[in-house]
Amino acid sequence: MNNLETVLITISLLTGGTETVNFDVPIHEAVSSSDVQVEYEIAESDINYLAKTLYGEARGIESKMEKAAVCWCILNRVDSDEYDFRNMKTIKDVVTAPNQFMGYDKDNPLVDELVDIAEDVLIRWHMEKDGVVEVGRVLPTEYTYFYGDGERNWFRTDWRSKEFWDWSWDNPYEENLNG
């Protein structure tokens, strides 16, 4: 239950449910990630699913940003209301679904660098869900498809699309993808 629901229920109980209350103040304001110091408990299984998927899908990619984008693509599917992803509500659902992330294998090793990237992205995702803006997301929410060739990854909004993400957002990992 959020704060607004708690306030409304309390007022309703105090007034016998007969009063209407209007709030002109924002209940939840967006804040920048630089203003927030929060620790998140991230499920180890979620980190492992992402890291093992990264091993299969992006281990040959040099760019941390492109590796992180694979994680964001997976999380975009978890959050998506698209028909294609209607039965994918967890990271496990997405990476183990038939014909989706072919690089996931339960026997893939957990490589420290990939575990660190997976955990970093999950922390940023949870911050975003808590209303923090500018968390260092590297892929817009509508990008739910990707393919890679072992050297680069390309992300798109539809599997048939010829238009790909242009890497125009700031890179929290500080490498230059455009030369």
Where are the language model's segments positioned?
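Bacterial extracytoplasmic/cell-wall-associated proteins, especially those involved in peptidoglycan
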Residues: A30-V31, D35-G179
